[in-house]
Amino acid sequence: MKSNKKILFIGAPGSGKGTISKILVEKYKLVHISTGDLFRKKISEDSQFAAQIQNYLSSGSYVPDEITNKLVADFIKKIPKNQGYILDGYPRTLQQLEFMIKNGINLDCVFYLKIKNETIISRLSQRLFCQKCQKSYNLLLAKPKNELKCDLDSTDLITRNDDRPEIITHRIEKFNNSVIPIVEFFKKSGIIYYLDAEQTLEETVIEIEKWL
């Protein structure tokens, strides 16, 4: 099954954006555009870039808009026009939204994943990542088959620096402060749908599929 829909997920860290995106990408043959993944890939390829943005990522701050905009725009240019995709983690600021509009990055639907702060902290404290392929796991929601080993390549799983409680709290505050104008814009456009991210991932995916 293939979809050509252009989709955006808005949600705080830990709302399930990445995991839900991966489920839909596999089922509907969509391209997953995650700013976090783009940053990590660029860091692994470019030591100068790594030095430039590592401090932003490790402190839970946003990477400057001009850097993020260029990475996302360059990636989208490579995608065929009839190919559907999911934007995960972009736009996060009003400036990024304005860049999107100016550069004709259009969307068919926007899903806002609503979640309580305490749930976010609980989920993120249980996240693990593969050091080699960057696949993510969650000991509450999406456990690895082998504890602390990646299902794909058996590499040791690690936690990320930005999943420490004090960094998580900062990231939540940053998200809440920046998301309001973005949500308001898409509300006026009539393409935003609100989802309860407190429910299971399976239940959330079923809701999303009603609009695909």
From Swiss-Prot:
Zn(2+) binds at residues 130, 133, 150, 153. Keywords: ATP-binding, Cytoplasm, Kinase, Metal-binding, Nucleotide biosynthesis, Nucleotide-binding, Transferase, Zinc. ATP binds at residues 14-19, 127, 136-137, 199. The keyword Membrane does not apply. GO terms for cellular component: cytoplasm. Pathway: Purine metabolism; AMP biosynthesis via salvage pathway; AMP from ADP: step 1/1. It catalyses: AMP + ATP = 2 ADP. It is an enzyme of class 2 (transferase). One of its GO terms (biological process) is AMP salvage. Residues 34-63 are annotated as: NMP. InterPro entries: Adenyl_kin_sub (IPR006259), Adenylat/UMP-CMP_kin (IPR000850), Adenylat_kinase_CS (IPR033690), Adenylate_kinase_lid-dom (IPR007862), ADK_active_lid_dom_sf (IPR036193), P-loop_NTPase (IPR027417). Residues 126-163 are annotated as: LID. Its EC number is 2.7.4.3. Its main location: cytoplasm. AMP binds at residues 35, 40, 61-63, 89-92, 96, 160, 171. It is found in: Cytoplasm. Coiled coil: none annotated. It holds the Pfam family ADK. GO terms for molecular function: adenylate kinase activity; ATP binding; zinc ion binding. Consists of three domains, a large central CORE domain and two small peripheral domains, NMPbind and LID, which undergo movements during catalysis. The LID domain closes over the site of phosphoryl transfer upon ATP binding. Assembling and dissambling the active center during each catalytic cycle provides an effective means to prevent ATP hydrolysis. Some bacteria have evolved a zinc-coordinating structure that stabilizes the LID domain. Catalyzes the reversible transfer of the terminal phosphate group between ATP and AMP. Plays an important role in cellular energy homeostasis and in adenine nucleotide metabolism. Monomer. Belongs to the adenylate kinase family. This is Adenylate kinase. It comes from Mesomycoplasma hyopneumoniae (strain J / ATCC 25934 / NCTC 10110).
